[in-house]
Every structure is written in structure tokens, then in C-alpha cells.
């Protein structure tokens, strides 16, 4: 059998655009197809799937082949508990160098005092942040007050009292329905709600925007140890100067989760009071989403927290993932480029044009529009659920995700809205003209969904159906867009058949 690599090289002979990265990618697939066919085939299927859908899930993006290749190597075999140059294992010199470079690059990119690049995910980064705050602000002073140097010197009774004090600390953060994340403390099924006493703040029911006066009132009432700011489904920017003042007025630590908009900070779109770095005590983020890196987490902080973050292991982590840290380094270096800054600005320009087009068609968006990379469509006037819209749009090649509204009568599973974002489409090179085309396709699909009642066991459930003519038209328009803006154009899918 002629290998994928051989076919690729034959087809690429004499053509411009062939790269070492694409050659390496095909070589890896060749090996997997021979050694573990089921895995190799699934990777190819996923590539085909991503190349046949408009990826509009706001939390997703496309990483470069360089980022992906940095993950696929023997760095995964190295244990490196500890921090650079202070490991619990020997022979970590190369991993030390990589992690040190990653830390320094993160500090340069975000103009931060210190950085921890070890968290495996955004949820891990958030957990590390809250543990660092409790350790530094509660445990440290308590240990010193008792005349000890370390927590290990406490008696069992003293340690029990310390744990009770830590768990009694108050956290004030955005509710899930108002755009917060499940790790912001207000979802009882999540571990964060079990670490502290958590209280939510919500968007204003009329403006659907966060009300700083109300947040200030709640902060004065609850006196939180931690004030959380950030979002996963909120389409406006935040004023971190105001939030910092609220935190200072009630003696709170300001923790910002910028997982969704880190790339917009790195790219110079969010500046001054919209940039959390000069104002927050601790900032967490993922390294994918708008940063276009590997799946992973990152914590940035003021110098005050540096020694605590350097003890991420054993605070809440064991061994970091050095192969992913290598990929994070690549992505962060890519984000330092002029091209990335242009990309970040285009993401927001595209989102605004997309929102304007939806509004011109008469759809309702939460907050009335967007100032960042995403928006949430209220489907109430169309009489369909977010789950139905998500499924039907997926069937014509458009990937979105259902999203609950601040006052959602349907519930968190089916929801009354869908969330859309522009990071991935912008990575493909699409601009404002394409956003208008995409909006037109989506609106036509949504407005032509018909509901039919189906019996499932003892219950009745609505199911969405789309006339085949409308569905085929949408598929054709999506296909034409993706042919003009292919994912990884240097990789010929014909060679993968």
C-alpha cells in the first residue's frame, strides 16, 4: 500500500507550500494507520469533520501544526514534579529549560510579574488560583500567628480549625446563567463550591450587563475573601479598574478568569481598564480558545503570589505535562507576533459584523450585541430550544453550542439560546464579508426549523426538522465557504482517502 506520506510527496512535487510541518504530520498519521488503525482513522475522520464544519463554538479554535507537533514527542515520558530547577526528580535539565522559557514568554506576552504554566486545564488553573489565595491569605497568617513556620507543625486540632476557617471564606462570582463558568463557585456539583462559601452576582435583568453598583453592594454585604470576574458566555467587556476598587473597598482578592479573552488581551484589543493584568491579584486562563494553543491552563499573578505558585506541586498538582508546556511555549511565542495582533483585532471586528447582521434580520442577542469574540442568540421568538438549534445547525455543517439565558424557562440542558464565536473562522482567514454570509445561512436555517412531537417512553419531546431543500442549500453554502478557507490547506485531504 502506498503510504499517505508518499502520496503527499508525489502530489506536492514541484508545488509551493510544502512544509516540514505538514510532512511530519502525514508521517505521524502514516505510522498510526499502520500500527493502530482505529486511532489513525479517527484522527483523519476528525480532520475531515473539522474541515467540513464552520466552527463557531466560542471556546474552540485551531492550533498551528507547530503547536501540535510540539506535543507529540518523548517529553511526555518525563516526570518533573516541582518547579524549574527545583524538581523532585533528577535529569530534568531539558524540561527545566522548556518550562523556564514558557514562563518568561508568558510574562513578556502579558506583562505579568509571575506565571505558572503547569495547570493541565483552565479548571486546574482556577483550582490552583483559589488554593493559592487561601494558602497565602488564610493559611500563612494563621500558621505565623500560632508561632509556626510551616503548616506541618500544626497539631491535628489546630489543623482542623484552620481547614474550617478556610472553608468558611466567602467567594463572590458571576452566576452560571449570567455568563459565569461552573468553576466560579456557584455550581454545587463542582468542587469549587465545596472549598468556600460561594455567592453569585447576576447581570441586570433589563440591560443583561453586569451592574457594578450591584456587585459593590453584594461585596459590602458578603465581604468576600475572593471576588471573581470573568465569563464564558458574556458578550461585553469588563472594567477591571472598577472591579479592583470594589475588591479593595471590601478587602477582597481580585481574581480574573480571562480564559475566553486572553488572546484579545495578548493581541492588544483589550487595553487600559479592559486589561485585567494591571488590576487583578491573580489571573487565570486557558491556553487554547483565543490564544490558539494546546489545551491547557495558565496562572498569572502579582509578585506577592510567586512563592506560592512555585509550589503548585504539592499544593494541588503532581507532575506537569512537559510536552504540553512545550506546545504552550510555541503558542505564546506565536502570540507575540504582529500577525497575531492583527488576528485578535479581526476576531472582534468579525464578531461585531456577525452580530450586526443577526440584528438586521430581527434576531435578539443578549445585551443587544457584542464587544468581544462571541454572542448569545435568544431563540425565544423562534419557538425552538438551543438543543434543537444546535442539532439542526450541526446537520448542515455549522458547529455552535446551546447556552442558557439569564432567565431561562427551558432549563440548562435544552436551553433557550445558542452561543456563537468568531475565533476559529478568523483563524481560517474569514473576514466581515464572510460573517454576513454566515449570518444569512444561520438565520435561514433557524427560521425554517419545524417542530414535531415524538413520544419517548412516557414523555413527549419536540424534535426539530428542516426541509431538505433548505438543508441542502445551507450545506452547499457552507461547503463553498470552507473550500475558499480550508483548514490546514497544506494538507491535501485527497491523499487521506
UniProtKB/Swiss-Prot annotation:
Amino-acid biosynthesis as UniProt keyword: yes
Keywords (A to Z) from UniProt: Amino-acid biosynthesis, Cytoplasm, One-carbon metabolism, Pyridoxal phosphate, Transferase
List of residues that carry N6-(pyridoxal phosphate)lysine: 289
Cofactor: pyridoxal 5'-phosphate
InterPro entries, A to Z: PyrdxlP-dep_Trfase, PyrdxlP-dep_Trfase_major, PyrdxlP-dep_Trfase_small, Ser_HO-MeTrfase, Ser_HO-MeTrfase-like, Ser_HO-MeTrfase_PLP_BS, SHMT-like_dom
Record field: catalytic activity: (6R)-5,10-methylene-5,6,7,8-tetrahydrofolate + glycine + H2O = (6S)-5,6,7,8-tetrahydrofolate + L-serine
Name of this protein: Serine hydroxymethyltransferase
Amino acid at each position: 500500500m502506498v503510504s499517505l506520506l508518499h502520496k503527499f510527496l508525489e502530489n506536492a512535487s514541484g508545488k509551493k507550500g510544502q512544509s516540514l510541518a505538514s510532512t511530519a504530520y502525514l508521517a505521524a498519521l502514516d505510522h498510526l494507520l499502520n500500527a493502530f488503525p482505529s486511532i489513525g482513522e479517527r484522527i483523519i475522520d476528525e480532520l475531515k469533520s473539522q474541515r467540513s464544519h464552520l466552527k463557531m463554538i466560542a471556546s474552540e479554535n485551531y492550533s498551528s501544526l507547530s503547536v501540535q507537533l510540539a506535543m507529540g514527542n518523548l517529553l511526555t515520558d518525563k516526570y518533573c514534579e516541582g518547579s524549574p530547577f527545583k524538581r523532585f526528580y533528577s535529569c530534568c535539565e531539558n524540561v527545566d529549560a522548556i518550562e523556564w522559557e514558557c514562563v518568561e514568554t508568558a510574562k513578556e506576552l502579558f506583562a505579568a510579574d509571575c506565571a505558572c504554566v503547569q495547570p493541565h486545564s483552565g479548571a486546574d488553573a482556577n483550582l490552583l488560583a483559589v488554593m493559592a489565595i487561601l494558602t497565602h491569605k488564610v493559611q500563612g497568617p494563621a500558621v505565623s500567628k500560632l508561632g509556626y513556620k510551616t503548616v506541618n507543625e500544626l497539631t491535628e486540632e489546630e489543623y482542623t480549625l484552620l481547614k474550617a476557617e478556610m472553608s468558611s471564606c466567602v467567594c463572590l462570582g458571576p452566576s452560571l446563567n449570567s455568563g459565569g463558568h461552573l468553576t466560579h463557585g456557584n455550581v454545587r456539583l463542582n468542587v469549587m463550591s465545596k472549598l468556600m462559601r460561594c455567592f453569585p452576582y447576576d447581570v441586570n435583568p433589563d440591560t443583561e450587563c453586569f451592574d457594578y453598583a450591584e456587585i459593590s453592594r453584594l461585596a459590602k454585604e458578603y465581604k468576600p475573601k475572593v471576588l471573581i470576574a470573568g465569563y464564558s458566555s458574556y458578550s461585553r467587556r469588563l472594567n477591571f479598574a472598577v472591579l479592583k476598587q470594589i475588591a479593595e473597598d471590601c478587602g477582597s482578592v481580585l481574581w480574573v478568569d480571562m480564559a475566553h479573552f486572553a488572546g484579545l488581551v495578548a493581541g492588544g484589543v483589550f487595553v487600559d481598564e479592559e486589561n485585567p493584568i494591571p488590576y487583578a491579584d491573580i489571573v487565570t486562563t486557558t491556553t487554547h480558545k483565543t490564544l490558539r494553543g494546546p489545551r491547557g491552563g495558565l496562572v498569572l499573578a502579582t509578585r506577592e503570589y510567586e512563592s506560592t505558585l512555585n509550589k503548585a506541586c504539592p499544593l494541588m498538582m503532581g507532575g506537569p505535562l512537559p510536552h504540553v508546556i512545550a506546545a504552550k511555549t510555541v503558542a505564546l511565542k506565536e502570540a507575540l507576533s504582529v500577525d497575531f495582533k492583527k488576528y485578535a483585532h479581526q476576531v472582534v471586528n468579525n464578531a461585531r459584523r456577525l452580530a450586526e447582521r443577526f440584528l438586521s434580520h430581527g434576531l435578539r442577542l443578549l445585551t443587544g450585541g457584542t464587544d468581544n469574540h462571541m454572542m448569545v442568540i435568544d431563540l425565544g421568538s423562534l419557538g425552538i430550544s438551543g438543543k434543537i438549534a444546535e442539532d439542526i445547525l450541526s446537520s448542515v455543517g455549522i458547529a455552535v453550542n446551546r447556552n442558557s439565558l439569564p432567565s431561562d424557562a427551558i432549563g440548562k440542558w435544552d436551553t433557550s439560546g445558542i452561543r456563537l464565536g468568531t475565533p476559529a473562522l478568523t483563524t481560517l482567514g474569514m473576514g466581515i464579508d464572510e460573517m454576513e454570509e454566515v449570518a444569512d445561512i444561520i438565520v435561514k436555517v433557524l427560521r425554517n426549523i419545524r417542530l414535531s412531537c415524538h413520544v419517548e417512553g412516557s414523555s413527549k419531546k419536540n424534535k426539530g426538522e428542516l426541509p431538505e431543500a433548505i438543508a441542502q442549500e445551507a450545506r452547499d453554502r457552507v461547503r463553498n465557504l470552507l473550500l475558499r478557507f480550508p483548514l490546514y490547506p497544506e494538507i491535501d485531504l485527497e491523499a487521506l482517502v
